[in-house]
Regions:
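Mature N-terminal, pre-catalytic/accessory segment of carbohydrate-active enzymes
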Residues: 12-152
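Bacterial N-terminal signal peptides
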Residues: 2-13
């Protein structure tokens, strides 16, 4: 009885609150959308990234190729099953919870459980979630295109 209650509590605990701490700056990218594409290119398919950004897959492909990324590589089922901690870490300072959940294809309960119970992840992430504005795709301006060429 106690173990069932404990499991129920663990599975229904809410996500930790966001802090007032701003996300880590990413001055080496033209904007957060470019950083998002760069960090997720080998881990998440373009369709999912586009869905999170409110873009078309072609937009994500164009951004990746403009920064010199090849492919995209095939995302195997093994990568989809095993890369979730890397995906969380790479996007912790880029995405609000809602978009992170959409990227992972998870529920709030799944993410909350993973943060608490999987490999001390909440501690490793600094025991806080910065307040990140939602990412929304917009076509890159001339300055962003120039920076894309420098990155490539």
């Amino acid at each position: 009885m106690i173990s069932i209650t404990l499991i129920t509590l663990l599975l229904t605990a809410p996500l930790p609150a966001t802090s007032d701490t701003p996300p880590v700056a990413i001055p080496h990218f033209p904007d957060a959308v470019h950083a998002f594409v760069w960090r997720n290119w080998p881990l998440v398919d373009c369709e999912r990234m586009a869905q999170v950004l409110g873009a078309k897959p072609e937009d994500v492909l164009r951004l990746g190729h403009a920064m010199g990324l090849e492919g995209p590589p095939p995302i195997t089922s093994e990568v989809k099953d095993r890369a979730y901690i890397t995906i969380i870490r790479r996007n912790w300072h880029l995405l609000p919870y809602e978009q992170l959940l959409e990227l992972l294809g998870w529920t709030e309960e799944e993410l909350a459980y993973t943060l608490r119970e999987d490999d001390f992840l909440w501690i490793k992430l600094g025991s806080m979630k910065p307040t990140c504005p939602p990412l929304k795709y917009t076509p890159p301006d001339e300055a962003a295109q120039a920076r894309e060429k420098e990155i490539a």
